[in-house]
Amino acid sequence: MRLIIAGGGTGGHLFPGIAVADEFLARSPENEVLFVGTERGIEARLLPKLGYKLALISASGMKGMGTIKKIMSAGRLLYGYSQSRKILKEFRPDLVLGVGGYASAPIVLAARGMGIRRFIHEQNAFPGLTNKVLGRFVDGVFISMPEAESFFPKEMTQMTGNPIRKEILWGFQERVRSIGDTFSILVFGGSAGAQRVNSALLEALPHLEGVKGKLRITHQTGEKDAARVREGYQAQGFQAQVLSFIDDMSAAYGAADLVVCRAGATTIAEVTACGKGCIFIPFPYAADDHQRKNAESLVHKNAGVMILEEDLTGERLAAKILELMEHPAELAEIEKNARALAQLDAAQAIVSAMVSKN
């Protein structure tokens, strides 16, 4: 069988697609996968390095644009639709899966016009406009959070969870916490980092002076902010490993007692799979404020803590860190609740559902 996985742009869209691709390829040596994305997305840089086939099309969003840019974007979408039909004719897939991102819509709509079975996966609690529209034209919708169910036709919607990269699942080893041990904090803001989160950690350090000797911090900053953050830790005498990018996230999760992070859907899938207590700082400019809704989904189940960026100060962040550090039973309860929300077989469920409907 042949599968096209369309979308990307960010790791939050791409990584679930990679997990599905790996599961599909593992089912049979005769199976083939082709990714379709745009040259500006993370897929153009990452997928060739990982050995996956990738076709590129023209596509961009329209939300928040002026009239001229919307017209230009519509032109790219029409051209992308034409490119998509050509790709479908050449690759001849049995199945198409849209995982979100600009490339998802042209391929899924072209597949509908050519009678190819097509599906979408929604990672977030609150779907974006593209997936809400595409949900009317597909044979199945896979969702990661129950809050998304009401946005799609009930008869074709399946709760699967968000597929997780196999290296996260296979490589994760829980760190055994002991009384009097150091307390390890993992900080990251997505694959590109998050300057506001980085600054908040540095602003929190004076308020953590009393536990300086116990803290061990691993901080993924993004490439642009690494030097500034590293100097900030050194100036205040805190032991921290500052990295522009963490290659082995499974080891980073395993070593962490607490995670400070954004609330993208892939991040939430990974931290729940690893049973980590988190302080979520949702990115306030995410489409339809979906990161806040993602975080709220966990906070309402006592499976995480949230600080909105508008309320974020170094003092407030330090207070939350100290509260969880000094009350291990409270942190353990959050970890237990987070782990209970994990759906480790999401990729298997999606592949099985697509194949069974073919």
UniProtKB/Swiss-Prot annotation:
The keyword Acetylation does not apply. Keywords: Cell cycle, Cell division, Cell inner membrane, Cell membrane, Cell shape, Cell wall biogenesis/degradation, Glycosyltransferase, Membrane, Peptidoglycan synthesis, Transferase. UDP-N-acetyl-alpha-D-glucosamine binds at residues 10-12, 124, 165, 191, 246, 291. It is a peripheral membrane protein. GO terms for biological process: carbohydrate metabolic process; cell division; cell wall organization; lipid glycosylation; peptidoglycan biosynthetic process; regulation of cell shape. It comes from the Bacteria. SUPFAM superfamilies: UDP-Glycosyltransferase/glycogen phosphorylase. Pathway: Cell wall biogenesis; peptidoglycan biosynthesis. It is an enzyme of class 2 (transferase). It catalyses: di-trans,octa-cis-undecaprenyl diphospho-N-acetyl-alpha-D-muramoyl-L-alanyl-D-glutamyl-meso-2,6-diaminopimeloyl-D-alanyl-D-alanine + UDP-N-acetyl-alpha-D-glucosamine = di-trans,octa-cis-undecaprenyl diphospho-[N-acetyl-alpha-D-glucosaminyl-(1->4)]-N-acetyl-alpha-D-muramoyl-L-alanyl-D-glutamyl-meso-2,6-diaminopimeloyl-D-alanyl-D-alanine + UDP + H(+). One of its GO terms (cellular component) is plasma membrane. One of its GO terms (molecular function) is UDP-N-acetyl-D-glucosamine:N-acetylmuramoyl-L-alanyl-D-glutamyl-meso-2,6-diaminopimelyl-D-alanyl-D-alanine-diphosphoundecaprenol 4-beta-N-acetylglucosaminlytransferase activity. InterPro entries: GlcNAc_MurG (IPR006009), Glyco_trans_28_C (IPR007235), GlycoTrans_28_N (IPR004276). Cell wall formation. Catalyzes the transfer of a GlcNAc subunit on undecaprenyl-pyrophosphoryl-MurNAc-pentapeptide (lipid intermediate I) to form undecaprenyl-pyrophosphoryl-MurNAc-(pentapeptide)GlcNAc (lipid intermediate II). This is UDP-N-acetylglucosamine--N-acetylmuramyl-(pentapeptide) pyrophosphoryl-undecaprenol N-acetylglucosamine transferase. The lineage of its organism: Bacteria, Pseudomonadati, Thermodesulfobacteriota, Desulfuromonadia, Geobacterales.
